[in-house]
Design a protein with these regions (language model features):
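ATP-dependent carboxylate-amine ligase
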Residues: 1-117
């Protein structure tokens, strides 16, 4: 599961989101969602606080595109890679600026890379 938490939102929910992802996924990839005005690393610290470091596999990658590609490249036949949080959004908000970004486009490109070796 690729998961993050939005910036300038309820910090108390972030560890809960990390814990929920870990309970329901074999591998958790923590990444940026829409950090808005917050430091993306601080947001990931908050989400990671909900993880049990002894349980399961997880990694941390601030760059959402890199995180999505890594999750897809690590997937094996029969795996389901869930890319959570942003859904249909076509932007990522960083430092108050909405930059073009699409989970769907990144995932399609990563799947094409895997398919063509």
């Amino acid at each position: 599961a690729v998961v993050g938490a939005g910036g300038d939102r309820d910090r108390g929910k972030r560890p809960l989101m990390g814990g929920a992802a870990q309970r329901h996924a074999d591998v958790v990839v923590l990444t940026s969602d829409n950090p808005r005005s917050e430091d993306p690393d601080r947001i990931l610290d908050d989400v990671a606080a909900g993880l049990d470091v002894e349980l399961g596999t997880w990694l941390r990658e601030v760059d959402r595109a890199v995180a999505i590609r890594a999750a897809i490249q690590e997937g094996r036949p029969g795996d389901c890679v869930a890319i959570l949080g942003k859904g249909h959004e076509d932007y990522q908000e960083v430092d108050g600026v909405r930059r073009p970004f699409s989970d769907v486009d990144v995932a399609r490109a990563a799947l094409a890379e895997v398919a063509h070796g």
